[in-house]
Amino acid sequence: MGSRLHVQEIQGGPPLPYEDDIRAFCKEYAELLDAHDPLRRFRDEFIVPSKKDLKRKTLFPNDETEETSDEECIYLCGNSLGLQPRSTRKYIEYYLRTWATKGVTGHFVPHDDQLLPPFVNVDEAGAKLMAPIVGALKSEVAVMGTLTANLHLLMASFYRPTRERYKIIIEGKAFPSDHYAVESQIRHHNLDPKDAMVLIESDDLDRPILDTEYILRVIDENAHSTALILLSAIQFYTGQYFDIQRITAHAQSKGILVGWDCAHAAGNVDLRLHDWNVDFAAWCTYKYLNAGPGGMAALFVHERHGRVDMEQAASGKEAFHPRFSGWWGGDKQTRFLMNNHFVPQQGAAGFQLSNPSVLDMNAVVASLELFNQTSMAEIRKKSLNLTGYLEHLLLRDPQTESSEKRPFSIITPSNPAERGAQLSIRLQPGLLDRVLESLDEDAVIIDERKPDVIRVAPAPLYNTYVEVWRFAQLFHLACDKALRGRE
């Protein structure tokens, strides 16, 4: 196949340039898509584990793995843990050098060659870079804490049950930590989750998707008794991308506050948290945002909830939205006066508790700097193409195009507007372990959700069309091998 093949610029998803082209199943086609990818340079900004790295039982090279290939693995697991940016090491080394050579003065003294401002201001640097990724004002974002801890802090502020309004609505198959957090918040207020926790459940096990109309119906049925809604922007299991704007507006019209867990959405889809009038949100940074395992999380508080009346606060009156408070959330002009009179910073920064880990912040910023070299609109555009190509290769393969021949189905919505990068693939019963074993032998990194689902998520900053093509070939072979082994 020559370069005469025309590759369109995709706007908003299908129809894709490969939709009716049998050549889409050739490696050369994927190579051409990569050649036309405006984000292809970012691949080199990340460290991709090699087959040798994965097989080696030590962190550093030894003689046992010399015969293993240096070829890079196929890493399609950015929805679980993003790859390490090459710049992360440099940022952390600069932090360690500052600490080693400046000690406590590193909190306040700037340097000509610094990558981040002095320790006392690193949180501002993180918020500035994070805000455009989630469609927020800088003042609406704080990079702090961890995801579940931040959800607890936000619910402590926004879940204020009354005799009439006391329920929290959450999806029935929410990530367990979210479920635990909501349940414990309800118990903390001496309420019974059986009465105060509304679970939105799908009644179709073969299609565990929550249609927007159904969600709105559940809201209507519980409107007069609901205080808060907490939903996932993208559902971790199915990969469904909820209609944040519509659900938020509908719930708020009923007097309900709305929060979103954006763990699988931040760095994945083009969020507009401010414009969509979201009350609050929280997310981690170790998935699509590539800040490392357990990396520092972030939260969003809409500006209308973050305002502080400084005159009222100075007189000791309640002048801000209730929250759990800590010294790092205090006004910078008075933070070090130690006078025990708390006046919060304006915006989300006023929800901070302790000084942030500068070590963790460096890992966050190293990745965010890459995101800020492009835009979420461009990242989302490639993601629509990349995941659409993956879906096409899985479902339209000439060998298994008939659904009756396929030993799997895709439970993620087929509408690209209703999903992010991830496709959740449900295998026929009894195939999962065999398929995973084959993929592992071929150094393919994805993740599983028992009993029968694998999640595959091409990350547009570092994954390529050729990788997606290679995965599809290996996945079909793994399925064939698993079927033969079951006979």
From Swiss-Prot:
What keywords are annotated for this sequence in UniProt? Answer: Cytoplasm, Hydrolase, Pyridine nucleotide biosynthesis, Pyridoxal phosphate
One GO cellular component assignment for this chain's record is: cytoplasm
The places in or outside the cell where this protein is found are: Cytoplasm
Enzyme Commission number(s) from the entry: 3.7.1.3
From the UniProt record, which GO molecular function terms apply? kynureninase activity; pyridoxal phosphate binding
Task: Please state the pathway this protein functions in, per its UniProt record.
Answer: Amino-acid degradation; L-kynurenine degradation; L-alanine and anthranilate from L-kynurenine: step 1/1; Cofactor biosynthesis; NAD(+) biosynthesis; quinolinate from L-kynurenine: step 2/3
N6-(pyridoxal phosphate)lysine modification sites? Answer: K287
Q: How does it assemble?
A: Homodimer.
Q: Which family does it belong to?
A: Belongs to the kynureninase family.
UniProt-recorded name of the protein: Kynureninase 1
Please give the organism. Answer: Neosartorya fischeri (strain ATCC 1020 / DSM 3700 / CBS 544.65 / FGSC A1164 / JCM 1740 / NRRL 181 / WB 181)
Q: Which gene encodes it?
A: bna5-1
